[in-house]
């Protein structure tokens, strides 16, 4: 039967086969949170209140406690459960003069296996005069073949305070996963009074687990942390920081240094559990207050 005869085989009516539907490209997520907070009233220890909050995509920001405390605590929630290749997540925070805010995450952030595209996380911070922000997310877990590009940018007033803690886990420990092929690119740029005071870049590309196994790079570490304090007077607390690090759990290697008006702590461990415990213990003493409740769950 010819194509024309076949097409007219149903009572003389043309029956045209539908063209195959195009296969949809992988769905990407664009998550956005924009937050602005300010101090309520004129008292120096007045509570911090939300001035403006915008949310988009799978990112949400929740405030479990809004009492009379000066520091407002917020919890970032990724309703998508993780970050996939091609996703772009952006968090922007403005802390106005005299206000104080703590931001954490509801759980560890998972960076899924990529089909080639990068996942991108952009964090932009601004802290006004005498303001304070504690940026304390829970750990980021990179799956094998994950590709993550992360940027952290902050602009601080001359007397503002910023405390940052970032923990990365290279592979899912429960599965004994190795990063045979992955990308982790982490870039920090922090300015005070318009002047660059801290710049740090990390790039792990390729066989990351093999790279971290080398003595000169990670010594077999599968979890790493950077804690950075840019509060006025932080540089003068170097001896205190080193004393705290001497009491960390076995298996955690750590060091502290201070220069240019800030203090930095690095930690390495073969697993996330001891490193997470070490970071939480250090931060609780350093901040002189308990860690957020989500860290204790």
UniProtKB/Swiss-Prot annotation:
<keyword id="KW-0996">Nickel insertion</keyword>
<keyword id="KW-0963">Cytoplasm</keyword>
<protein>
    <recommendedName>
        <fullName>Urease accessory protein UreD 2</fullName>
    </recommendedName>
</protein>
<comment type="subunit">
    <text>UreD, UreF and UreG form a complex that acts as a GTP-hydrolysis-dependent molecular chaperone, activating the urease apoprotein by helping to assemble the nickel containing metallocenter of UreC. The UreE protein probably delivers the nickel.</text>
</comment>
<comment type="function">
    <text>Required for maturation of urease via the functional incorporation of the urease nickel metallocenter.</text>
</comment>
<keyword id="KW-0143">Chaperone</keyword>
<dbReference type="InterPro" id="IPR002669">
    <property type="entry name" value="UreD"/>
</dbReference>
<dbReference type="GO" id="GO:0016151">
    <property type="term" value="F:nickel cation binding"/>
</dbReference>
<dbReference type="GO" id="GO:0005737">
    <property type="term" value="C:cytoplasm"/>
</dbReference>
<dbReference type="Pfam" id="PF01774">
    <property type="entry name" value="UreD"/>
</dbReference>
<comment type="similarity">
    <text>Belongs to the UreD family.</text>
</comment>
